[in-house]
């Protein structure tokens, strides 16, 4: 998860990472000016950053002079997942949680979004659950909410300053109240905003917490405690 800025943040590095993230999450090749518009940076600066990323092989330029992920980005992603051991440790635990017949998910918080490393509905092969969903707003996600609750109110306020907050029409005070409730419970229970009347139950893992595990589906209140117990056990083993 993102930490608060230190005394001397490197703005050039921050801009480079913002450019890298925007490129990584774009579903199709994107031009320099459009990418600059998305992240609110000067096109000249973004052009220099993209050319540097292309030189490093992290980005690549298409025939029509747009940019997309290069081989270096995929190598970095694979190396980080392999070196951390997170997926290797998580897969057996996630597979065990599928016994409840609900969707099983593993994700991490990045700014105001959640990136799902694993998301498998009932009946889906576990291998197909890897990387099948991209970014989602943290406040509509059980994993996002339980990881936001690990942050202090000041940090959460800085993330959402001047922004509309999905699922929280009354804004920041409503979100902070919900996060306080999650901290007290030790888990998140989030209603899915559609007509299925589904809920998500999620817990955090790690010390400090850096990843979330969740079950989602038709989960009545009375069915929540055993799911929380199973999630906590999985989170404990994942954090070892």
Which residues make up each language-model segment?
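Amphipathic alpha-helical regulatory segments at dimerization interfaces
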Residues: 22, 49, 88-100, 181, ...
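Short amphipathic alpha-helical signal-transduction/dimerization elements
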Residues: 24, 148, 152, 232-240
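Extended hydrophobic
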Residues: 168-239
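Amphipathic alpha-helical effector-binding/dimerization core
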Residues: 65-161
């Amino acid at each position: 998860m993102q930490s608060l800025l230190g005394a001397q943040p490197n703005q050039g590095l921050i801009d480079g990472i913002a450019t890298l993230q925007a490129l990584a999450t774009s579903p199709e090749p994107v031009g320099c000016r459009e990418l600059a518009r998305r992240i609110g940076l000067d096109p000249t600066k973004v052009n220099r950053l993209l050319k540097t990323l292309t030189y490093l092989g992290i980005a690549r330029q298409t025939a029509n002079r747009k940019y997309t992920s290069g081989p270096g980005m995929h190598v970095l992603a694979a190396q980080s997942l392999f070196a951390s051991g997170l997926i290797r440790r998580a897969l057996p635990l996630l597979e065990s949680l599928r016994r409840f017949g609900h969707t099983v998910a593993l994700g991490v918080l990045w700014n105001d979004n959640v990136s799902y490393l694993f998301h498998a509905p009932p009946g889906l092969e576990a291998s197909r659950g890897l990387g099948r969903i991209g970014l989602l707003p943290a406040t509509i996600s059980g994993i996002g909410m339980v990881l936001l609750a690990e942050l202090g109110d000041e940090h959460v306020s800085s993330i959402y300053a001047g922004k509309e907050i999905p699922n929280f029409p009354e804004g920041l005070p409503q979100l902070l109240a919900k996060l306080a409730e999650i901290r007290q419970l030790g888990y998140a229970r989030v209603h899915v905003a559609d007509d299925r009347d589904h809920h998500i139950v999620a817990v955090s893992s790690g010390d400090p917490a850096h990843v979330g595990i969740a079950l989602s589906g038709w989960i009545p209140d009375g069915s929540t405690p055993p799911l929380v117990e199973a999630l906590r056990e999985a989170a404990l083993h994942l954090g070892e």
